[in-house]
Amino acid sequence: MFKITREEIEWGGRTLVLETGKIARQADGAVLATYGDTTVLATVVGERKPKPGLDFFPLTVNYQEKTYAAGKIPGGFFKREGRPSEKETLVSRLIDRPIRPLFIKGFKNETQVIATVVSHDMENDPDIVAMIAVSAALTISGLPFLGPIGAARVGYIGGEYKLNPMIDEMPESALDLVVAGTADAVMMVESEAKELSEDIMLGAVMFGHKEFQPVIDMIIRMAEKCAKEPRAIDVKDNSELVAKVRELAESDVRAAYGLKDKGQRHEALAAAKDKVKSALCNPEDPNAVSETDVGGVFKSIESDVVRNSILDTKSRIDGRDLETVRPIVSEVGVLPRTHGSALFTRGETQALVVATLGTGDDEQFIDALEGTYKENFLLHYNFPPFSVGETGRVGFTGRREVGHGKLAWRALRAVLPPKTEFPYTLRLVSEITESNGSSSMATVCGSSLAMMDAGVPLKRAVAGIAMGLILEGERFAVLSDILGDEDHLGDMDFKVAGTQEGVTSLQMDIKITGINERIMKQALAQAKGGRLHILGEMAKALDTARPEMGEYAPRIEVITVPTDKIREVIGTGGKVIREIVEKTGAKVDISDDGTIKVASSDGESIRKAIAWIQGIVAEPEVGKIYEGTVVKAVDFGAFVNFFGPRDGLVHISQMAPTRVEQVSDVVKEGDKVKVKLLGFDDRGKVRLSMKHVNQETGEEIVYENEPAEQPREKREGGGGRGRRRERD
C-alpha cells in the first residue's frame, strides 16, 4: 500500500531521518523529518495554473506547533490550538526567506507550505528540523524549486563552534545563529550574539554552511529515488513588451532616479508608469497587454537603471557614495509623562521609541512546547501606513512587524542588566513615523536611547545598520544604510546591530541564488564602520544611562526573607499581603525562594511596605524596649501590638510598680505604651512589661531586690504545668 523512501544520516551527534511515501500522499510533496525524537511533517501543494493578475509569487508558509507533540493539552476554554504564537510566526518567516528566491522567475502559481511539529523531545529545537523537512518536500514535489537547501544552528560555547546545540546548552552559548543555503552559497542568516567580533560571526556562518552539506546530499539522494516529474511551467516571452516599455519609459525612469527626494521621485515614477499604461494598455481590447504585465516590466527597467548606475558611477539614488550614512538626529526625553523616550531620525527614516518600566505583575506568560515561562523584556514594533505616505489597515500586527520587533529585541538583549540587579519588567514600543529603509535598525538605535533615558543601566549603547548589495556577474557593490528603493531593487538585505565591542545581532536575506564569503566579509567590515559612526551620533544626545529613573517610573526594592516566613507575610488567604498593599499603596511580589519585590512610584510607600514586612519576619529581642499600641484589654492584662503585626501580653502584675485593681485604671484600647520584652512563656507567647519602662522617657526602670528576669527561648507549645506551680 505504501511506497516508502527513507534516508538516514548521523548529523551533529544525533540521527536525522527523512521519510516520504506514507503520510500525506495527496500533497505534491510530503516529508516526515525526525531529529532525535523531534519530528516535523512538511507538506507542499502548488496550484496547477497561475493566479491571474499577480505581479509576485503567491507563496504562503505556515509553521505550526501541536501541543500533543510535547504531551500537553492546550489551555483556555476551547482546548485546541488557536492563533499562531510569536514563535510560530517567526519560524514561518525563517522557512520562507531562504526558499522564496529559489523558485524560478515568472512562476505565479499559488503555493502553500505547511510544517507541523508532531513530536518534540525537549532537546532539539523543531525550527531546523522544519526547514530541512520543507526543503526535502519541495525538492521531490515537481515544483520549479532550484534547491535543495540545508539549514543548521550554530552555537559558540567555550570559544568553539557547536553544531545544533541542544536546548539546555543554549544558555551557555554566546551565539544563537541559524544559517540556511544551497550547496554553493548562503541564502539566509538569523542570529543573536553576546558582543562577538565580525570574524567570529563570519566564521559561524561558514561553519554552518559547511556542516549542513551532508543534509543537502541526503535530500538529493532521496529526490533521485522518488521525486515527481518536473511540472511544465508556462513562462511568457515578454521580450517584445520589454523593448516597448524601455523605449517609452527608460529616459523618464533615469530622470526620476536623479531626484533625491523620495516623494518627488515616486511621483515622477508614477507619472512615467501611467504614460506607458496609457500607450500600451486597452481594457476594451482582450488582446492588449495587462497593466500587471506592464507593471512587472516597468519594475525590471527601474532595477536595471538603478543597479547599472550604482555599479558604473559608485553613486547612489540620493547622491551618497557607497559607504556614507544618511544624516542622523537623536533626541531623548521627547515625551513628558513617559518613563523614557527617544526620537531617532536617519534621513527619511524615523522611529519614536518609548520605554516603560513595570513590576513582576507585568511580565508576559509564554506558553511554549518546552513549558510555560515568563518574559520580562518586551519590544513591540509598529509600522503604521502613514509612515510611507499611504492609507491602510490599522491595529493588525502582521508577520513583518513581529519579525522586525524580534530582530531589534535580539539586538538589545545582550546589553541588558541582569534581573538580580534590575528587577523591572521592561517594555519598548517603537512607532515608525517615517520609513525609507532600515526601520528595524532605527528601532534598535531609538530603543537603546529610550532605555538610557529611562535610567536602565545598559552595559553599552547599541546601534544597527542595514547593508545592501548590487551583484552583476563579477561586479558588485556593497551599500551602507540602504534606502527603501535600494532594498527593493537590490540583491541583499544585510542587517547588523551591535556595540563598540562587537555584534549582538545579524540578519541576512538574499534575493538571488546566494553570495559568497568574500562579499559577506566586505559587508561586515563596512557595517562595522557604519555602526561605530551611528553610535557616535547617538552619543551626542545621551552617551550613558541616566543615574536616576524618571519621575513617573516605579521604584522597585528587593529584600529577602527566610522561606519559612513566606506564609506569615502572605497570611491566611492572602489577608496580610492584601493589607500591606492596601495600606501602603505599594505592589508586593513574593517568589518561592523568599525574594520579595516591593514596587511603587512613591518612595515612602516602598519604605512603609518594607518596614511592615521586616516587622513580620523579624524576631523581637528579649530585654529590648518597644513602643506599642493597646489592642485589647482583658481582666488579667492588656494585649499590646508592639512589633509590626506581633502582639504580646502585659500581665496586670506588670502594668505598674504598685498593685493594680482594674486594667482599665491604667490603659484602654488605642493607648500608646512603652513595653519591655521579658521573654516567652512555655507556649511561645510573648510576655511584656510596662512597669519596667518609664512611660514618659522610654528609659528602663530597674527595681532593687527584684529577681532578674531569666530570658527563656521561644518555645512552640508544650506543657509546663509544674513550672507554672513553681512561679505561683
Swiss-Prot record:
Biased composition, class Acidic residues, residue ranges: 697-707
Look up keyword Lipoprotein and say if it applies: no
Q: Which gene encodes it?
A: pnp
Q: What class of enzyme is it?
A: transferase
Q: Which CDD domains match?
A: KH-I_PNPase, RNase_PH_PNPase_1, RNase_PH_PNPase_2, S1_PNPase
Q: What does this protein do?
A: Involved in mRNA degradation. Catalyzes the phosphorolysis of single-stranded polyribonucleotides processively in the 3'- to 5'-direction.
Q: What is its EC number?
A: 2.7.7.8
Q: Which PROSITE patterns match?
A: KH_TYPE_1, S1
Q: Name one GO molecular function term.
A: magnesium ion binding
Domain named KH is located at 554-613
Query: Protein name, please?
Result: Polyribonucleotide nucleotidyltransferase
Reaction catalyzed: RNA(n+1) + phosphate = RNA(n) + a ribonucleoside 5'-diphosphate
Q: Looking at the record, which segments are called Disordered?
A: 697-728
Cofactor(s) listed in the protein's UniProt record: Mg(2+)
State where the protein is found: Cytoplasm
